[in-house]
Curated annotation (Swiss-Prot):
<keyword id="KW-0648">Protein biosynthesis</keyword>
<dbReference type="InterPro" id="IPR044135">
    <property type="entry name" value="Met-tRNA-FMT_C"/>
</dbReference>
<protein>
    <recommendedName>
        <fullName>Methionyl-tRNA formyltransferase</fullName>
        <ecNumber>2.1.2.9</ecNumber>
    </recommendedName>
</protein>
<dbReference type="InterPro" id="IPR011034">
    <property type="entry name" value="Formyl_transferase-like_C_sf"/>
</dbReference>
<keyword id="KW-0808">Transferase</keyword>
<dbReference type="InterPro" id="IPR036477">
    <property type="entry name" value="Formyl_transf_N_sf"/>
</dbReference>
<dbReference type="Pfam" id="PF02911">
    <property type="entry name" value="Formyl_trans_C"/>
</dbReference>
<dbReference type="InterPro" id="IPR002376">
    <property type="entry name" value="Formyl_transf_N"/>
</dbReference>
<dbReference type="GO" id="GO:0004479">
    <property type="term" value="F:methionyl-tRNA formyltransferase activity"/>
</dbReference>
<comment type="similarity">
    <text>Belongs to the Fmt family.</text>
</comment>
<dbReference type="Pfam" id="PF00551">
    <property type="entry name" value="Formyl_trans_N"/>
</dbReference>
<feature type="binding site">
    <location>
        <begin position="108"/>
        <end position="111"/>
    </location>
    <ligand>
        <name>(6S)-5,6,7,8-tetrahydrofolate</name>
    </ligand>
</feature>
<dbReference type="InterPro" id="IPR005794">
    <property type="entry name" value="Fmt"/>
</dbReference>
<comment type="function">
    <text>Attaches a formyl group to the free amino group of methionyl-tRNA(fMet). The formyl group appears to play a dual role in the initiator identity of N-formylmethionyl-tRNA by promoting its recognition by IF2 and preventing the misappropriation of this tRNA by the elongation apparatus.</text>
</comment>
<dbReference type="InterPro" id="IPR041711">
    <property type="entry name" value="Met-tRNA-FMT_N"/>
</dbReference>
<dbReference type="InterPro" id="IPR005793">
    <property type="entry name" value="Formyl_trans_C"/>
</dbReference>
<dbReference type="GO" id="GO:0005829">
    <property type="term" value="C:cytosol"/>
</dbReference>
Protein backbone atom coordinates (compact mmCIF):
# COMPACT_ATOMS: atom_id res chain seq x y z
CA UNK A 1 0.00 0.00 0.00
CA UNK A 2 0.87 3.67 -0.32
CA UNK A 3 0.32 5.84 2.74
CA UNK A 4 -0.41 9.54 2.38
CA UNK A 5 -0.34 11.82 5.43
CA UNK A 6 1.35 14.81 7.02
CA UNK A 7 0.44 15.87 10.60
CA UNK A 8 0.66 13.99 13.88
CA UNK A 9 -3.02 13.07 13.42
CA UNK A 10 -1.99 10.61 10.69
CA UNK A 11 0.83 8.89 12.60
CA UNK A 12 -1.34 6.40 14.59
CA UNK A 13 -2.81 5.05 11.35
CA UNK A 14 0.64 4.67 9.77
CA UNK A 15 1.85 2.89 12.91
CA UNK A 16 -1.20 0.63 13.09
CA UNK A 17 -0.94 -0.48 9.47
CA UNK A 18 2.81 -0.99 9.67
CA UNK A 19 2.59 -2.91 12.96
CA UNK A 20 -0.19 -5.12 11.55
CA UNK A 21 2.04 -6.42 8.79
CA UNK A 22 0.73 -4.50 5.81
CA UNK A 23 3.45 -3.86 3.25
CA UNK A 24 3.87 -0.12 2.93
CA UNK A 25 5.75 0.40 -0.33
CA UNK A 26 5.89 4.17 0.05
CA UNK A 27 4.88 7.12 2.21
CA UNK A 28 3.89 10.47 0.69
CA UNK A 29 4.00 13.57 2.90
CA UNK A 30 4.19 17.33 2.56
CA UNK A 31 7.65 18.91 2.17
CA UNK A 32 9.50 20.31 5.17
CA UNK A 33 7.99 23.56 6.46
CA UNK A 34 9.09 26.27 8.83
CA UNK A 35 7.43 25.79 12.17
CA UNK A 36 7.95 26.01 15.91
CA UNK A 37 9.44 28.78 18.03
CA UNK A 38 12.67 28.88 16.04
CA UNK A 39 10.82 29.00 12.71
CA UNK A 40 13.20 26.34 11.41
CA UNK A 41 12.64 23.92 8.54
CA UNK A 42 11.18 20.77 10.07
CA UNK A 43 9.97 17.46 8.72
CA UNK A 44 6.29 16.64 9.09
CA UNK A 45 5.43 14.13 11.83
CA UNK A 46 4.56 11.52 9.18
CA UNK A 47 7.82 12.08 7.31
CA UNK A 48 9.76 11.74 10.56
CA UNK A 49 7.98 8.50 11.45
CA UNK A 50 8.53 7.10 7.94
CA UNK A 51 12.24 7.85 8.22
CA UNK A 52 12.36 6.20 11.65
CA UNK A 53 10.73 3.09 10.17
CA UNK A 54 12.95 3.04 7.09
CA UNK A 55 10.05 3.47 4.68
CA UNK A 56 10.46 4.87 1.20
CA UNK A 57 9.49 8.53 1.23
CA UNK A 58 8.13 11.08 -1.25
CA UNK A 59 7.54 14.77 -0.50
CA UNK A 60 5.97 16.49 -3.53
CA UNK A 61 5.41 20.23 -3.34
CA UNK A 62 2.24 19.82 -5.43
CA UNK A 63 1.51 16.26 -6.51
CA UNK A 64 -0.91 17.40 -9.23
CA UNK A 65 1.95 19.06 -11.13
CA UNK A 66 4.70 16.51 -10.55
CA UNK A 67 4.41 13.87 -13.25
CA UNK A 68 7.78 12.32 -12.44
CA UNK A 69 6.71 11.50 -8.88
CA UNK A 70 3.33 10.26 -10.11
CA UNK A 71 5.11 7.88 -12.48
CA UNK A 72 7.41 6.69 -9.71
CA UNK A 73 4.46 6.03 -7.43
CA UNK A 74 2.72 4.11 -10.19
CA UNK A 75 5.81 1.94 -10.65
CA UNK A 76 5.47 0.77 -7.04
CA UNK A 77 2.24 -1.04 -8.05
CA UNK A 78 0.50 -0.45 -4.74
CA UNK A 79 -2.81 -2.28 -4.34
CA UNK A 80 -4.36 0.54 -2.32
CA UNK A 81 -3.71 4.09 -1.13
CA UNK A 82 -4.57 5.07 2.44
CA UNK A 83 -4.89 8.84 2.96
CA UNK A 84 -5.07 10.62 6.32
CA UNK A 85 -4.77 14.42 6.40
CA UNK A 86 -2.29 14.60 3.53
CA UNK A 87 -3.10 18.23 2.77
CA UNK A 88 -3.36 18.24 -1.03
CA UNK A 89 -6.11 17.22 -3.43
CA UNK A 90 -5.13 14.13 -5.41
CA UNK A 91 -5.63 14.25 -9.19
CA UNK A 92 -7.42 11.50 -11.10
CA UNK A 93 -4.06 10.27 -12.41
CA UNK A 94 -3.21 9.34 -8.82
CA UNK A 95 -6.68 8.29 -7.67
CA UNK A 96 -7.01 5.79 -10.52
CA UNK A 97 -3.67 4.04 -9.93
CA UNK A 98 -4.35 1.47 -7.17
CA UNK A 99 -6.77 -1.33 -8.13
CA UNK A 100 -8.39 -1.32 -4.67
CA UNK A 101 -8.80 2.45 -4.74
CA UNK A 102 -7.80 5.41 -2.58
CA UNK A 103 -9.42 5.58 0.84
CA UNK A 104 -9.46 8.60 3.11
CA UNK A 105 -9.91 8.82 6.87
CA UNK A 106 -11.81 12.07 7.51
CA UNK A 107 -12.36 13.59 10.97
CA UNK A 108 -16.04 14.46 10.72
CA UNK A 109 -19.43 12.92 10.06
CA UNK A 110 -19.65 13.58 6.34
CA UNK A 111 -21.17 15.41 4.57
CA UNK A 112 -20.75 17.82 7.51
CA UNK A 113 -17.40 19.60 7.59
CA UNK A 114 -15.76 18.68 4.34
CA UNK A 115 -12.34 20.29 4.02
CA UNK A 116 -9.11 20.86 5.91
CA UNK A 117 -10.26 21.84 9.42
CA UNK A 118 -13.18 19.63 10.46
CA UNK A 119 -12.11 19.26 14.09
CA UNK A 120 -11.76 22.99 14.65
CA UNK A 121 -15.07 23.76 12.98
CA UNK A 122 -16.92 21.07 14.93
CA UNK A 123 -15.83 22.82 18.12
CA UNK A 124 -16.29 26.37 16.85
CA UNK A 125 -19.84 25.56 15.80
CA UNK A 126 -20.77 23.94 19.09
CA UNK A 127 -21.46 20.49 17.64
CA UNK A 128 -22.37 18.00 20.34
CA UNK A 129 -21.19 15.03 18.29
CA UNK A 130 -18.59 14.42 15.62
CA UNK A 131 -16.78 11.36 14.38
CA UNK A 132 -14.57 9.70 11.80
CA UNK A 133 -15.46 8.31 8.40
CA UNK A 134 -13.60 6.12 5.93
CA UNK A 135 -14.55 7.14 2.40
CA UNK A 136 -13.60 6.26 -1.15
CA UNK A 137 -11.84 9.22 -2.71
CA UNK A 138 -13.02 11.17 -5.73
CA UNK A 139 -11.63 14.31 -7.34
CA UNK A 140 -14.11 16.44 -5.39
CA UNK A 141 -13.30 17.73 -1.91
CA UNK A 142 -14.37 14.95 0.49
CA UNK A 143 -17.35 13.98 -1.67
CA UNK A 144 -16.82 10.23 -2.01
CA UNK A 145 -19.08 7.43 -0.75
CA UNK A 146 -18.66 6.44 2.89
CA UNK A 147 -17.67 2.93 3.92
CA UNK A 148 -18.00 3.35 7.68
CA UNK A 149 -18.48 6.10 10.25
CA UNK A 150 -18.10 6.17 14.02
CA UNK A 151 -19.75 8.87 16.13
CA UNK A 152 -18.34 10.36 19.34
CA UNK A 153 -19.70 12.93 21.78
CA UNK A 154 -17.78 16.18 22.23
CA UNK A 155 -17.15 17.22 25.83
CA UNK A 156 -17.78 20.82 26.89
CA UNK A 157 -14.21 21.17 28.16
CA UNK A 158 -12.54 19.27 25.31
CA UNK A 159 -10.13 21.26 23.17
CA UNK A 160 -9.04 20.67 19.58
CA UNK A 161 -5.87 18.85 20.59
CA UNK A 162 -7.70 16.45 22.90
CA UNK A 163 -10.44 15.76 20.36
CA UNK A 164 -7.84 15.27 17.62
CA UNK A 165 -6.05 12.66 19.71
CA UNK A 166 -9.28 10.74 20.23
CA UNK A 167 -10.28 10.87 16.58
CA UNK A 168 -6.83 9.91 15.31
CA UNK A 169 -6.98 6.70 17.36
CA UNK A 170 -10.44 5.95 15.97
CA UNK A 171 -9.17 6.57 12.43
CA UNK A 172 -6.43 3.98 12.91
CA UNK A 173 -8.92 1.49 14.33
CA UNK A 174 -11.42 1.97 11.51
CA UNK A 175 -8.76 1.46 8.86
CA UNK A 176 -7.64 -1.79 10.48
CA UNK A 177 -11.26 -2.96 10.56
CA UNK A 178 -11.93 -1.84 6.98
CA UNK A 179 -8.88 -3.23 5.20
CA UNK A 180 -10.10 -6.87 5.10
CA UNK A 181 -13.47 -5.73 3.70
CA UNK A 182 -11.82 -3.66 0.98
CA UNK A 183 -9.44 -6.47 0.08
CA UNK A 184 -12.25 -9.04 -0.01
CA UNK A 185 -14.24 -6.93 -2.47
CA UNK A 186 -11.21 -6.94 -4.75
CA UNK A 187 -10.66 -4.85 -7.89
CA UNK A 188 -13.24 -4.57 -10.63
CA UNK A 189 -16.14 -2.47 -11.81
CA UNK A 190 -16.71 0.36 -9.36
CA UNK A 191 -20.49 0.05 -9.14
CA UNK A 192 -20.21 -3.66 -8.32
CA UNK A 193 -17.53 -3.03 -5.69
CA UNK A 194 -19.62 -0.32 -4.04
CA UNK A 195 -22.58 -2.68 -3.88
CA UNK A 196 -20.49 -5.42 -2.30
CA UNK A 197 -18.90 -3.01 0.18
CA UNK A 198 -22.28 -1.41 0.96
CA UNK A 199 -20.85 2.09 0.77
CA UNK A 200 -23.29 4.96 1.23
CA UNK A 201 -23.34 7.92 -1.13
CA UNK A 202 -23.12 11.18 0.78
CA UNK A 203 -26.28 12.54 -0.82
CA UNK A 204 -28.11 9.66 0.89
CA UNK A 205 -26.81 10.69 4.33
CA UNK A 206 -29.00 13.06 6.37
CA UNK A 207 -27.79 16.65 6.48
CA UNK A 208 -26.55 19.20 3.98
CA UNK A 209 -22.85 19.49 3.15
CA UNK A 210 -20.89 22.07 5.12
CA UNK A 211 -17.33 23.18 4.50
CA UNK A 212 -14.51 23.73 6.98
CA UNK A 213 -12.85 26.77 5.45
CA UNK A 214 -9.25 27.70 6.14
CA UNK A 215 -8.89 29.75 9.31
CA UNK A 216 -7.27 33.20 9.33
CA UNK A 217 -5.45 35.11 12.05
CA UNK A 218 -8.57 37.23 12.59
CA UNK A 219 -10.56 34.10 13.43
CA UNK A 220 -8.31 33.66 16.48
CA UNK A 221 -9.20 37.01 18.07
CA UNK A 222 -11.44 36.86 21.14
CA UNK A 223 -14.18 39.50 21.04
CA UNK A 224 -15.46 39.96 24.58
CA UNK A 225 -18.72 41.42 23.24
CA UNK A 226 -19.67 37.88 22.27
CA UNK A 227 -21.39 35.40 24.55
CA UNK A 228 -19.38 33.36 27.03
CA UNK A 229 -20.25 30.19 25.13
CA UNK A 230 -19.09 31.59 21.78
CA UNK A 231 -15.83 32.70 23.37
CA UNK A 232 -15.37 29.33 25.05
CA UNK A 233 -15.94 27.50 21.76
CA UNK A 234 -13.33 29.69 20.09
CA UNK A 235 -10.80 28.93 22.82
CA UNK A 236 -11.45 25.19 22.61
CA UNK A 237 -11.64 25.05 18.82
CA UNK A 238 -8.53 27.11 18.15
CA UNK A 239 -6.44 25.71 21.00
CA UNK A 240 -3.80 26.77 21.85
CA UNK A 241 -3.86 29.96 19.79
CA UNK A 242 -7.05 31.96 20.44
CA UNK A 243 -5.93 35.30 21.82
CA UNK A 244 -6.87 38.60 23.36
CA UNK A 245 -4.65 41.48 24.46
CA UNK A 246 -3.25 42.52 27.79
CA UNK A 247 -1.44 45.86 28.08
CA UNK A 248 -0.59 45.80 24.37
CA UNK A 249 0.79 42.27 24.54
CA UNK A 250 -0.78 39.17 23.07
CA UNK A 251 -2.44 36.90 25.60
CA UNK A 252 -3.26 33.43 24.37
CA UNK A 253 -6.29 32.06 26.19
CA UNK A 254 -6.02 28.28 26.34
CA UNK A 255 -8.58 26.94 28.81
CA UNK A 256 -11.90 28.45 29.86
CA UNK A 257 -15.19 27.53 31.52
CA UNK A 258 -18.43 29.50 30.99
CA UNK A 259 -20.03 30.22 34.37
CA UNK A 260 -23.54 29.32 33.28
CA UNK A 261 -25.91 27.69 35.78
CA UNK A 262 -27.40 25.57 33.00
CA UNK A 263 -23.99 23.98 32.40
CA UNK A 264 -23.31 23.18 36.05
CA UNK A 265 -23.12 19.41 35.60
CA UNK A 266 -20.57 19.79 32.78
CA UNK A 267 -18.24 22.18 34.61
CA UNK A 268 -15.27 21.16 36.72
CA UNK A 269 -16.37 20.44 40.28
CA UNK A 270 -14.04 23.04 41.78
CA UNK A 271 -15.50 25.73 39.49
CA UNK A 272 -19.16 25.21 40.40
CA UNK A 273 -19.09 27.34 43.60
CA UNK A 274 -18.44 30.39 41.39
CA UNK A 275 -21.84 30.07 39.73
CA UNK A 276 -24.34 32.84 40.48
CA UNK A 277 -21.86 35.29 42.00
CA UNK A 278 -22.21 37.80 39.16
CA UNK A 279 -25.33 38.87 37.30
CA UNK A 280 -25.26 38.15 33.58
CA UNK A 281 -24.55 41.11 31.32
CA UNK A 282 -24.28 43.75 34.09
CA UNK A 283 -20.58 44.47 33.54
CA UNK A 284 -18.60 45.89 30.64
CA UNK A 285 -17.44 42.98 28.46
CA UNK A 286 -13.77 42.13 28.90
CA UNK A 287 -13.48 43.46 32.45
CA UNK A 288 -11.93 41.30 35.17
CA UNK A 289 -14.58 40.55 37.78
CA UNK A 290 -12.43 38.45 40.10
CA UNK A 291 -8.98 36.93 40.49
CA UNK A 292 -9.55 33.47 41.93
CA UNK A 293 -6.08 32.34 42.98
CA UNK A 294 -6.68 28.61 42.60
CA UNK A 295 -8.73 28.87 39.42
CA UNK A 296 -7.87 31.92 37.32
CA UNK A 297 -9.47 35.11 36.03
CA UNK A 298 -13.22 35.69 35.90
CA UNK A 299 -13.98 37.95 32.92
CA UNK A 300 -17.28 39.55 31.91
CA UNK A 301 -18.82 38.84 28.51
CA UNK A 302 -22.04 39.70 26.68
CA UNK A 303 -23.76 37.01 28.76
CA UNK A 304 -22.43 35.15 31.78
CA UNK A 305 -18.84 35.46 33.04
CA UNK A 306 -16.05 33.34 31.57
CA UNK A 307 -13.35 31.79 33.74
CA UNK A 308 -9.88 31.81 32.16
CA UNK A 309 -8.04 28.85 33.67
CA UNK A 310 -4.94 28.81 31.48
CA UNK A 311 -3.21 31.40 29.36
CA UNK A 312 0.12 32.38 27.88
CA UNK A 313 1.27 35.98 27.87
CA UNK A 314 3.57 37.01 25.03
CA UNK A 315 7.15 36.16 26.03
CA UNK A 316 6.05 33.88 28.88
CA UNK A 317 5.29 30.18 29.26
CA UNK A 318 1.84 28.68 29.72
CA UNK A 319 0.42 29.38 33.16
CA UNK A 320 -2.51 28.21 35.26
CA UNK A 321 -4.54 29.91 37.98
CA UNK A 322 -2.48 31.90 40.45
CA UNK A 323 0.67 31.84 38.30
CA UNK A 324 -1.26 33.36 35.40
CA UNK A 325 -2.67 36.08 37.68
CA UNK A 326 0.85 36.87 38.93
CA UNK A 327 2.30 36.99 35.42
CA UNK A 328 -0.38 39.44 34.32
CA UNK A 329 -0.29 41.36 37.61
CA UNK A 330 -4.04 41.39 37.14
CA UNK A 331 -6.50 43.22 39.36
CA UNK A 332 -10.27 43.51 39.40
CA UNK A 333 -11.57 46.14 36.99
CA UNK A 334 -8.81 45.86 34.42
CA UNK A 335 -9.81 44.99 30.87
CA UNK A 336 -8.75 42.53 28.19
CA UNK A 337 -8.77 43.16 24.48
CA UNK A 338 -8.00 46.89 24.59
CA UNK A 339 -5.40 48.73 22.51
CA UNK A 340 -4.02 45.78 20.57
CA UNK A 341 -3.57 45.59 16.82
CA UNK A 342 -2.84 42.33 15.00
Amino acid sequence: MLFWGTPSYAVPTLDALNDSGYEIVGVVSQPDRRRGRGNQQMASPVKQRAMDQGLRLFTPERIRDEGDIQAELKSLKADISVVVAFGQLLPSTVLNQPPLGCWNGHASLLPRWRGAGPIQWSLLSGDSVTGVGIMAMEEGLDTGPVLVQERVAIGLLENANQLSNRLSSITAKLFLESMPRIAAAGPGIESERWKQLEVIKQEEIEGDPTYARMLSKKDHILDWNQSAMDLHRRVMGLYPNAFSSWNNKRLKVQATEPLDEELKSKLSEEVRPLLGRWQDGEHEPGKILACESDLGLVVSTKTCPLLIRQGQLEGKSKALGEVLIQQLQATVGQGLGVGFNI
